[in-house]
Swiss-Prot record:
Residues 1-14, 124-285, 397-566 are extracellular. GO terms for cellular component: cytoplasm; mating projection tip; plasma membrane. Glycans are attached at residues 142, 185, 196, 221, 244, 256, 423, 430, 453, 459, 470, 510, 530, 542, 545, 566. The chain crosses the membrane at residues 15-35, 103-123, 286-306, 376-396, 567-587. InterPro entries: PRM1. GO terms for biological process: plasma membrane fusion involved in cytogamy; regulation of plasma membrane sterol distribution. Residues 36-102, 307-375, 588-703 are cytoplasmic. The gene is prm1. This is Plasma membrane fusion protein prm1.
Length: 703
């Protein structure tokens, strides 16, 4: 190599080494190590998942065996409940039959008693009436007969007197005739019997016999016997069935045992493959993206190096022109430009804004301060850690979404177990209910058949009686005016009571059956509620049998990533603290300037300050002070303000001067006057030819 500066090829060989590319490489390596560690943890989880699956299967088998135990207990409870229900119902029906029998007998006795009372009342009335009338008739008859007997006797006496007179006359005549005439005396011996006759009081004996004969006891007893016989037989049958009834549990079968596979090796393989493939896809996308970004940064850095190479070559010849045009208000600004052209261009852009001069300078200083290499390094560390953590969280969130397959496994297991229990419960409940219905049918047919027959027979008898009675009444009275009256009387006295009895019999007929309670279809599945199933399966997924749980992996890794993000946030806070220091510096500078301005207004200074175009001098200089002498040529000090290049000299310099490679080379190639250090700008008057000769000689000696 003919020179010590770096050529374009040397520059391009290191163009990939930049803060941005190093940041991307750091993120890439950290993300790669993160995914590798995550794959290892997930592999451990998949290896232990089989044990967890077996544990879940054991829990599921226990849950699926529980219906048989519940069914046995339910059958025993149902047996006791049905037997107690049947006994209570049949005992109640037996009591109802007794009550119905007594109601019937009461009605009959009531009806018989009513009519008996009416008949006896009528007979008693007749007897009383006859007795009163008979007594009066007897007295009248006896008196009349006595009077008649007396009248007859008087008449007979008169007749005898007449006959005696006639006999005397006839005897005189007969004596004349020589005949003996003897007329008989008229006598009625029955007159004494008539006088002694009295009307007997035994004429009402028949009525008394009728009264004594009006007695319905035999009819009532016969009716009681006729009515009590079917009721007693029905009641005895019910009591016999009650004492002998027992629910046959041998007919009830046990629930069918079922088996549900909640997870298998294929499922576990599919789940692990799915999660690992998701991690692989995300890692591939992130790595490819980072590699593309690094390649783009490499291309940009290469273009930037080429552009900077050409720019340095061009700026090397125009440097004096820039200095001459006072683009750099301060010589230290030139050094800043050489060290960091991007930062200087940003400051130059800010200076172009329509801001006050002091504010523009302070803003440029603040940007330089917060992006100074130490502060920029802290900001780069913070951003790099933050981006790396965000990428890791994105990967975790995507895997967490993919990990919902594990939750879906538990959920599917939950639905499978729930569906299996529901099917077993429905099948067993239906078969058991059929047996209960069969027992119910036997009870209704065997125990209540006689009650049905009795009530139907009584209803039929009452209907026949009413029809026959109506026919008799119709045939007796026909279309006479008494038909309606008799019908109303019969309706009042008999028909309504018979209709009420028919309603009672109908009610007994309708109620003379039993309805046994049926088992609900969810009797087995409802006993094991959904929360119990889900809690059992979920606890199995996170049981102690599994050394690594899916949620535990995410929790630990997420905590680590969050800690990294917290550290990046701390670095960012540290950079913000540096920004605060910069703001404090800007504020203190502004206060200092304000204080000096106020001080100049209050206390005028007779001396003039020799100042730079922007910053104030560190010490005052009087007006009459002359500048220091021109330093000797061997001190390598040049006047940057008044130096002029000739065109030929620039051409010779272009041929003889080596290309400036770096900002440090540029700083070495162009020595800076000591006046920069002392904050004093020297505007020395020098001869152009001497300066040009010295510059060319110096450069030829160096290169």
């Amino acid at each position: 190599m003919a020179s010590s500066y770096l050529s374009l090829a040397a520059r391009l060989s290191q163009c990939w080494i930049s803060p941005w590319s190093l940041c991307c490489l750091y993120i890439l390596m950290q993300f790669f190590l993160f995914t590798k560690d995550l794959n290892t943890k997930i592999g451990d989880f998949v290896n232990d998942e089989q044990a967890t699956c077996n544990y879940i299967q054991e829990k599921v088998d226990i849950l699926l065996d529980s219906p048989s135990l519940i069914a046995n207990a339910a059958v025993r409870v149902a047996k006791d409940g049905i037997q107690s229900t049947v006994k209570i119902i049949l005992s109640g029906i037996s009591d109802s039959l007794i009550a119905a029998e007594n109601v019937f007998i009461f009605f009959i006795e009531f009806s018989y008693g009513t009519y008996l009372c009416l008949i006896q009342l009528a007979i008693d009335g007749i007897l009383d009436a006859v007795a009163d009338v008979g007594e009066e008739i007897g007295t009248a008859v006896n008196d009349t007969l006595h009077a008649i007997a007396d009248e007859i006797e008087d008449t007979v006496s008169s007749l005898n007197e007449v006959f005696q007179s006639a006999e005397d006359s006839l005897e005189k005549v007969a004596s004349w005739l020589g005949e003996d005439i003897n007329l008989p005396n008229v006598s009625i011996p029955e007159i004494q019997s008539l006088r002694n006759f009295t009307l007997s009081s035994s004429y009402d004996t028949e009525f008394e016999k009728l009264k004594a004969g009006v007695n319905f006891d035999s009819a009532i007893n016969a009716t009681k016997a006729a009515i009590s016989k079917p009721f007693s037989s029905a009641r005895n049958l019910i009591l016999e069935k009650v004492s002998n009834y027992s629910f046959d549990t041998s007919m009830v079968s046990s629930p069918n045992k079922t088996h549900v596979v909640v997870c298998s090796t294929d499922d576990l393989t599919a789940i692990s493959s799915f999660i690992l493939s998701s991690i692989y896809k995300i890692r591939k996308v992130v790595i490819i993206s980072l590699l593309i970004i690094i390649a783009g940064l490499f291309l940009i850095s290469s273009i930037y190096e080429i552009w900077k190479w050409c720019r340095i070559r061009h700026k090397a010849f125009l440097l004096d022109e820039h200095i001459r045009s006072n683009k750099f208000e301060d010589t230290r600004d030139l050094i800043s430009y050489i060290e960091s052209p991007i930062s200087w261009n940003l400051k130059y852009f800010i200076s172009a804004l329509p801001l006050p001069c002091f504010l523009s300078v302070q803003l440029r200083w603040f940007i330089t301060y917060i992006f100074h290499p130490p502060a920029a390094m802290i900001l780069f560390i913070s951003c790099t850690s933050f981006i790396s953590g965000i990428l890791q969280l994105v990967l975790l969130n995507n895997i967490r979404e993919d990990g919902s397959v594990i939750s879906a496994l538990a959920q599917n297991s939950f639905h499978k177990v729930e569906s299996a229990l529901a099917n077993v419960s429905v099948a067993w409940a239906n078969s058991t209910n059929q047996i209960i219905l069969k027992n119910q049918e036997n009870i209704n047919n065997n125990m209540f058949g006689s009650i049905h027959n009795t009530t139907l027979s009584l209803n039929s008898t009452l209907n026949t009686f009413m029809n026959e009675l109506n026919s008799s009444m119709t045939s007796a009275f026909g279309d006479t005016f008494l038909a309606s009256t008799v019908q109303n009387v019969m309706n009042c006295l008999l028909y309504r009571k018979i209709e009420n009895f028919e309603e009672v019999l109908t009610w007994v007929y309708n109620k003379s059956h039993i309805e046994l309670p049926l088992l609900p279809t969810d009797i087995l599945s409802k006993s094991i509620d959904n929360q119990t199933i889900y809690s059992s399966l979920y606890s199995s997924l996170n049981s102690s049998n599994s050394t690594v749980s899916f949620s535990g992996i995410f929790d630990r890794v997420e905590k680590s990533v969050i800690s990294e993000l917290n550290f990046s946030f701390l670095f960012f806070l540290l950079w913000l603290l540096i920004c605060a220091f910069g703001l404090i510096g800007v504020l203190s500078s502004w206060l200092k300037s304000l204080f000096l301005s106020l001080l100049d207004l209050v206390i005028p200074n007779p001396k003039e300050n020799i100042t730079l175009p922007v910053q104030s001098l560190a010490f005052p200089v009087t007006k009459s002070c002359r500048p220091p002498p021109i330093p000797p040529r061997e001190s390598h000090v040049y006047d940057f303000q008044n130096f002029q290049y000739e065109e030929d000299d620039c051409i010779d310099y272009k041929r003889s001067l080596g290309l400036i490679s770096l900002s440090s080379d540029l700083a070495i190639d162009i020595p800076i006057s000591p006046a920069i250090i002392s904050d004093i700008q020297f505007n020395s008057i020098t001869t152009e030819s001497e300066e040009t000769t010295y510059l060319l000689k110096e450069k030829q000696d160096r290169y």
